[in-house]
Amino acid sequence: MENNRDKKTDDILEKLVHINRITKVVKGGRRFGFSALVVVGNQAGRIGIAHAKAKQVPDAIKKANEMARRKLIHIPLREGRTIHHDVKAKDGSGRIVLRSASKGTGIIAGGPVRAVCEVLGVKDIVAKSMGTSNAHNVIRATIKALKKQNSPKQISSIRNKKISEIVEKRG
C-alpha cells in the first residue's frame, strides 16, 4: 500500500497529499516553483501538517516534512483505532463530518482525509467532506474536527462524574 511518496522513518509516517506548481511574476518574466502539502504522524495519535514552497519538488517535500515534524499534536483515540464520538468542523468552505465506526469497518474517506487518518493511526472511521475539494481546507477542517472531540476522561472532569458512568452510556 505504501508507495515511493510515503516514507516511514523513525516511526513517523510521512504522506505527501498535494503538490502544486506556483509562479512568481518578476521583472524579467516568470519564476516557477513548487509547493507541497504533507501530513506526518506516528500512527498512534500524533499528527502534524505543513505546507512548504521551494524551487524543486524534492526540496519542497523535504521542507514540508521537517516543518510538520516540528508541529506534531496529540489527538485522543478510542481503543487506538477510532474517534470517541461523531464530530463536524468547517474551515474556509471545506466542511467535514467524522463518524466513529465499529471494528473492521476500515477507513471510509476520500483523498486528504484518508491520508490524515492513516498517519494518525485511525483504523475505523467514516468521513464525508463537503463544500470544497481543496486539500488545504479539507485537511485543516479535519484537524479542527479531531481537536474538537472529547475523550471520556475530559468529559468526566467537566461533568464531575466517574469515567465508568460516561463510558456506560456510549453507543
Predicted features along the sequence, with ranges:
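Ribosome-associated RNA-binding proteins
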Residues: 1-171
